[in-house]
Amino acid sequence: MSAPQLNKIAANSPSRQNPSELETAVAGALYDLESNTADLKAALRPLQFVSAREIEVGHGKKAIVIFVPVPSLQGFHRVQQRLTRELEKKFSDRHVLIVASRRILPRPKRSSRSRNTLKQKRPRSRTLTAVHDAILTDLVYPVEIVGKRLRVKEDGSKTLKVILDEKERGSVDYRLDTYSAVYRRLTGKNVLFEFPLVSAEY
C-alpha cells in the first residue's frame, strides 16, 4: 500500500500497522475517490477510517462496515450518500455502511473501594445502551428514526422494531435486511426495520 493510501487509516488504529486485505482495498478506494473526483476531493482529504469489516447479511450477500473516528463522523455525513454510492460501485454486490467507532465502558462496580477510586463518572455516551442506539442511527443515516418498539415474545426473546421515516422508503427499502443483519452482528440484538403503516384512504 502506498503512503498516501495508508494515510486514509487513522494513525491510532491498530489496522494502520497491519491492515487486512479489505482495509487495504477500502483505503485505496477512498484515496482514489479523493484524487480523481473533483467534488469529493476537499471533503475526503481530512477523513480517515479506523477499520473495516465484511459481514454476511444472508442470501449469499455481504456488507462492508467502515468504522470511522467519532470526531470525523460529521465529515463523512456531509458526503455520505455520494460516497457510499461510489464505494458500492467499486465493491460490487456489497452494501457499504459507515459507523462511528465507539467504546463501551463497563458499569462501575458497587464496592466502596471502587467508588472511592473512581476518578470520573462514566459518560452516558459510553454506556452500552447509548452506544447501541448510536449504532442504529449511524446505520440508517441519513434516514430519520421516527419510533421504536420493543417486542418481547413468550420465550423471553426480544426484538426491537425500528420505525423509519416514510419519505425515505424508496431509497432504503432494499437495504433493510442489511441493516438488521449488521446490527445483530455488531450488538447481538435482534432488530426489525420497517416503515409506518399507512392506512388506506376511502
From Swiss-Prot:
Q: Does the keyword Ribosomal protein apply?
A: yes
Q: Which UniProt keywords apply?
A: Cytoplasm, Ribonucleoprotein, Ribosomal protein
Its chief place of residence is cytoplasm
Please name the InterPro entries in this protein's record. Ribosomal_eS7, Ribosomal_eS7_CS
Pfam family name, one: Ribosomal_S7e
Q: What is one GO cellular-component annotation here? A: small-subunit processome
Using the UniProt annotation, give all residue ranges assigned to the region (Disordered).
1-20
Outline the subunit composition. Answer: Component of the small ribosomal subunit (SSU). Mature N.crassa ribosomes consist of a small (40S) and a large (60S) subunit. The 40S small subunit contains 1 molecule of ribosomal RNA (18S rRNA) and at least 32 different proteins. The large 60S subunit contains 3 rRNA molecules (26S, 5.8S and 5S rRNA) and at least 42 different proteins.
Described purpose of this protein according to its UniProt entry: Component of the ribosome, a large ribonucleoprotein complex responsible for the synthesis of proteins in the cell. The small ribosomal subunit (SSU) binds messenger RNAs (mRNAs) and translates the encoded message by selecting cognate aminoacyl-transfer RNA (tRNA) molecules. The large subunit (LSU) contains the ribosomal catalytic site termed the peptidyl transferase center (PTC), which catalyzes the formation of peptide bonds, thereby polymerizing the amino acids delivered by tRNAs into a polypeptide chain.
What's this protein's family per the entry?
A: Belongs to the eukaryotic ribosomal protein eS7 family.
What is the name of this protein? Small ribosomal subunit protein eS7
